[in-house]
């Protein structure tokens, strides 16, 4: 089951390019964003974000972000 808050964290990281800026946009801590993404990656069984500066979505991450935009 994909939950809204995890998908929102993924979309924010991809949009903002960093966990820290995504956390500010979502009004949570960077560790909360990281934990949500990690749990989502575990559920999906693959990496969703390439960590770096800037953070970028993998192909699967991009598809999930597109799904999030439609929901």
State where each predicted segment sits:
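Short, basic-rich loop-to-helix N-cap that marks the start of a DNA-contacting helix
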Residues: 1-5, 56-62
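Alpha-helical residues within the helix-turn-helix
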Residues: 24, 42, 62
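A short LG(V/I)-centered, amphipathic sequence patch enriched
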Residues: 41-57
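Conserved hydrophobic/aromatic "anchor" residues
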Residues: 7-10, 19, 49
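Short helix-boundary/capping micro-motifs
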Residues: 12-27
